């Protein structure tokens, strides 16, 4: 005679996402001890998650609040809009903030519902049956403007930006966050661009100009012009503003009395 009920099987399936026969076997093996059955299935689930480790997690969402931005990945957009998945992302943001975590390692070790964030993510992964991954985390301590962008109305945000700033104009800071979301700058200012990258851009510009047959006496001016083009594409403060293309982002921020001190941009599935 079975020492468990159909309700136990149903509850175990709902909690772990395991199949009916797996749940029955787990309850039989543990003589109806529900907690041990859950543990056994979670161990099995964890192994299954490991087998799924090479799958791509190109879907998911970004979530942000109180100076914390996270990217939580899934394999499909179906899971990305799952209520439990969205709730987990928001809980992770709160856990990271509470723990004062500064990097992914710290975020995964942060406490959440009596476990670590990493354990909770893995448990939901086992339940849903897809690889889930907390991919990256960014945090700022100062005043922060946040912008989240949805690719479509039925999906959670896929692009998230935090802009840390000083000054009183939240509107100007949010405009900068929208700029970062739209034009994807890699650096805040020219000083942040690594010297080797500047040297490479300068060399490429010079070699290209020579290959185009430009006169030697004009090379320096041409190279500087092309290097400025690189800065306009990649440096936030040098970019033409999406709000007023006749002005740079820096010019608009200066007018508003705002100084951007840092930013982070996450886009689901992108580097």
Curated annotation (Swiss-Prot):
This is Elongation factor Ts. Associates with the EF-Tu.GDP complex and induces the exchange of GDP to GTP. It remains bound to the aminoacyl-tRNA.EF-Tu.GTP complex up to the GTP hydrolysis stage on the ribosome. CDD domains: UBA_EF-Ts. GO terms for molecular function: translation elongation factor activity. Residues 76-79 are annotated as: Involved in Mg(2+) ion dislocation from EF-Tu. GO terms for cellular component: cytoplasm. NCBIfam families: tsf (TIGR00116). It is found in: Cytoplasm.
């Amino acid at each position: 005679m079975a020492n468990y009920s159909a309700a136990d099987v149903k509850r175990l399936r709902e909690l772990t996402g395991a199949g009916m026969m797996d749940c029955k076997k787990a309850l039989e093996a543990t003589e109806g001890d529900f907690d041990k059955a859950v543990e056994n299935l979670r161990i099995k689930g964890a192994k299954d998650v490991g087998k799924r480790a090479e799958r791509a997690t190109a879907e998911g969402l970004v979530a942000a609040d109180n100076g914390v931005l996270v990217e939580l990945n899934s394999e499909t957009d179906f899971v990305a809009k799952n209520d439990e998945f969205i709730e987990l992302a928001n809980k992770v943001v709160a856990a990271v903030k509470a723990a004062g975590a500064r990097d992914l390692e710290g975020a995964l070790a942060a406490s959440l519902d009596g476990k670590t964030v990493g354990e909770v993510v893995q448990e939901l992964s086992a339940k849903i049956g897809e690889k889930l991954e907390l991919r990256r985390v960014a945090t700022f301590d100062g005043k922060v403007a946040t912008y989240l962008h949805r690719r479509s109305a039925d999906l959670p945000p896929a692009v998230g930006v935090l802009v840390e700033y000083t000054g009183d104009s939240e509107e100007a800071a949010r405009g900068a966050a929208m700029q970062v979301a739209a034009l994807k700058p890699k650096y805040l200012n020219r000083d942040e661009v690594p010297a080797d990258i500047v040297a490479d851009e300068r060399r490429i510009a010079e070699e290209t100009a020579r290959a185009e047959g430009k006169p030697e006496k004009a090379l320096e001016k041409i190279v500087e012009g092309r290097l400025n083009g690189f800065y306009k594409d990649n440096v936030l403060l040098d970019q033409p503003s999406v709000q007023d293309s006749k002005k740079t982002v820096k010019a608009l921020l200066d007018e508003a009395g705002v100084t951007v001190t840092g930013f982070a941009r996450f886009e689901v599935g992108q580097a």
